[in-house]
């Protein structure tokens, strides 16, 4: 989910996400239910980058693609699972890159597999994520080699 949407959803509840240096606070937290607070915490790093103006649409496209690939592996029903399955059946190298990426997230502390990898991203995972994204876009745009 785009951090912009998360911020908008919080504001609809009469609260606001506020940046204080490198930390994130919820103004009027009494207006936000606990599950949403936990959801916000799971996307904290991305939200902070967004509020600082450092989160581009291109970066979001890459991260959203990785989120969808992780959902695919977790067995989450998505419209594009068949497309991802087809891609992986034709692109072994991408499968290996995704496996390496998942190991990196694990090494960075990602243990609750039902939460976003957002807080476990690093320069190394960002670089590998971009490589995977570019391979996916190339495949889905017709270069199936």
Model features per residue range: what roles?
Residues 4-7, 23, 33, 39, ...:
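Phosphate/adenylate-binding glycine loop and adjacent helical scaffold
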Residues 9-33:
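Eukaryotic low-complexity, mixed-charge intrinsically disordered interaction/regulatory segments enriched
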């Amino acid at each position: 989910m785009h951090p912009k949407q998360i911020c908008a959803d919080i504001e609809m509840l009469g609260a606001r996400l506020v940046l204080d240096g490198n930390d994130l606070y919820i103004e009027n937290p009494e207006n936000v239910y606990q599950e949403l607070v936990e959801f916000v915490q799971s996307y904290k790093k991305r939200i902070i980058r967004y509020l600082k103006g450092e989160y581009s649409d291109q970066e979001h496209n890459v991260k959203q693609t990785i989120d969808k690939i992780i959902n695919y592996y977790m067995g989450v029903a998505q419209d594009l699972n068949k497309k991802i399955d087809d891609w992986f059946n034709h692109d072994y190298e991408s499968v290996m890159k995704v496996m390496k990426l998942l190991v990196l997230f694990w090494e960075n502390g990602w243990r609750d597999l039902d939460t976003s990898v957002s807080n476990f991203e690093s320069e190394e995972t960002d670089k590998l994520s971009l490589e995977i994204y570019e391979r996916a876009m190339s495949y889905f745009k017709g270069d199936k080699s």
